[in-house]
């Protein structure tokens, strides 16, 4: 039995992982349960304990820090295999991770390339990040550093903490930014959920034109559709289907394989130039 512990199950990215992992487990005849801790460490600990009492053999934990280590260690001591996804702490049997700062620089590189080609290396942007966990803070810093390096004449007008997976924050923040900065040319977000909301706010303000760009990360279907349809959504980082990737490695654990080193999960930059490789209109 597999348990999936997610920071939220309200965003398209996390819902997609949950649904795909559930499907993969069903295909293998494994029982499956998922829970969201809504970025609350106490809720995460409770969910882990419930998965142990619910006879989970494997827990896929997308924790954001070390606050769950004791609960994960207690689960491990009862024979549960721990798969950490995204963040590496001291307690795990397998880690699937990404270099969050590197992801940030890749998002920033996409934005800088567009700013250089479309606006001659000039322009005014805002960056949406969050300081609620170290990973997203690192990603946000990578965004800023890459833009400063590759498009040094672009003005980063403001770096905004929009919270972690807060539904609606992209909309309200973008409405504020558009009112505050009439000369805004772009928004660079740590994740697609806020970016997709931002695109809609930009459209509503009548600024969805060739000189406005939104960039983010996750490769959600909504973000890919925005790129494909020619909106101001210009680029996203695409994670290969994480549900399938996780299931593949759980199968290897089932088969007795052990892992000494973390596994880097594959990720790809997607823009208008290669959108056809990642998005099909009938999805």
Model feature map: region roles:
Residues 1-283:
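A residue-level marker of the well-folded mature domains of exported/periplasmic proteins
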